[in-house]
């Protein structure tokens, strides 16, 4: 098909047809406008065909070792010789338990350790709301001196004593609001949205109470400069960076908040502190995995869209600084860390179209975790579900798994 201009006309032809398909009679002004638009379009087509400038080596890559300028390839080469000194090797339960003690001690050191003395909780209820299927209480407590946690307690109706309880930890985004049914305007919503799909409410729908906490550097736990940007901007860069400067980590800080949340659960008569689980997605999955390692009061855990290898996720794809533990690859891979939860029940779910925690590495990592569980004689206590979806909460098998193992 061709377009041509005649005197006062626009002619559209098709080579397969004997004559013009269309002839439009136009004023000179219309033709001038159309000609200008056509010229602009031609420039855009030429620009689209022109390779985008990527740096000073454009046009010289055939003259240099191009791979030598790629930092990710460089780190992958370093990974090949990573020590992984405490990666799992045991073949019997006795050796496996000793391995757990050794690796837990090392990872605790890498995280920056945990406070030996816990300050009083000084908890305070801020608000109570009633909904058709549950009751929602907003509360705060002191985690560390000068560091406070906001949370929501969701208890199912009708009210009963000693509810099995899930600690729910969200990932990057708007913070805890996004898992308890609160929209970006602070209003209640009835449709489960976002990539986390209000999974704290879903836990309640499966018969458990949910204690959803605001992770440090998200939501209301951000500095004033970050809050001024938008609801989804995290304060991880200044806060997690500061942790590293102090020889600590954001993961360690968030894990300690989970420990303190369970301290708070123990003060509530309607919650059964002997039936506590922990679940989280993405960065909340990170927190859940590490918290389950160090907090024995967590009886079952669900890690959504996190379990992978360090190599194929945070070492290969751009991720937030809050994910990193200095020196951990000298000692272990991610599957080793997850194996420290054994033999307590662990459920893992992974999206087949997750671009930041690639599915093949998730599957391979889980197989390594399962082998650790098998050495403990607990192979049936860990499961993975892969689903046809992106980086998002699924819960189809995971929530029933948690309810079953917490005797709901």
Residue spans of the language-model regions?
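Non-catalytic accessory segments flanking enzyme active sites
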Residues: 76-155
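Mobile cap/lid helix-loop segments that gate and shape the active-site cleft of serine hydrolases
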Residues: 238, 242-246, 260-261, 298-339, ...
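Proline/glycine-enriched tight loop/beta-turn segments at coil->beta junctions
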Residues: 147-148, 157-165
